Amino acid sequence: MTMSDLRRRGLLIILSSPSGAGKSTLARRLMAWDETLSFSVSATTRQARPGEEDGVHYRFLPEAEFKSLVSSGQMLEHAHVFGNFYGSPMAPVSQAIEAGHDVLFDIDWQGAQQIRNSDLGKHTLSIFILPPSIPELKRRLESRAQDSDDVIEKRMRKSWDEISRWDAYDYVLVNDDLSVTEERLKTIITAERLRREQQPALQTHVRALQTEFEDLEQ
């Protein structure tokens, strides 16, 4: 049996960071590096905005259906934000990882904690991206030219609450050089894919080795 025959389970890869730390750019680079990586499609009870497609940008659900999924344990994580519910349905993620595909999650520390405590928690890899400094974080937000000064100020105030949760993650990277951080992320993911728990065919392979060994001794 070759390494290519040892089909692996996929990983639930959680990327978290304060806004402006480079998480979205890194996620795009990871998906360009490995086309089997995909983002988890969240479910929400809010109305679709112009241009949004059901099943592509979000799964748009009635509130009763969303709550039913939560109460029956079919949501990996969920939250109530500005009057609407958001969450990650378990079924499509389970199907993806059993097929050997990794799923990316762009969620905060609370969502990460819920996923780690779920039935799929043992297949979770959590990574937090830190900025090199607070002034640099603010500079990056300002350089986007996407938000007003008030919005930037709100993002900056929220950033410390997110940064203070850094020690709840498996890996923490300081993104002072995007290319270096990208390579470190790839190294982490490559190694985590080889965890014993992620390779269910190993047991069969070892049994085959045992049989071959016993045949040699006969």
From Swiss-Prot:
InterPro entries: GK/Ca_channel_bsu (IPR008145), Guanylate_kin-like_dom (IPR008144), Guanylate_kinase (IPR017665), Guanylate_kinase_CS (IPR020590), P-loop_NTPase (IPR027417). ATP binds at S17, P18, S19, G20, A21, G22, K23, S24. Its EC number is 2.7.4.8. It holds the Pfam family Guanylate_kin. It comes from the Bacteria. GO terms for molecular function: ATP binding; guanylate kinase activity. GO terms for cellular component: cytosol. Residues 10-190 form the Guanylate kinase-like domain. It catalyses: GMP + ATP = GDP + ADP. It is found in: Cytoplasm. Keywords: ATP-binding, Cytoplasm, Kinase, Nucleotide-binding, Transferase. Its main location: cytoplasm. The keyword Ion transport does not apply. The keyword Kinase applies. Gene3D superfamilies: Guanylate Kinase phosphate binding domain, P-loop containing nucleotide triphosphate hydrolases. Belongs to the guanylate kinase family. NCBIfam families: guanyl_kin. Essential for recycling GMP and indirectly, cGMP. This is Guanylate kinase. It comes from Jannaschia sp. (strain CCS1).
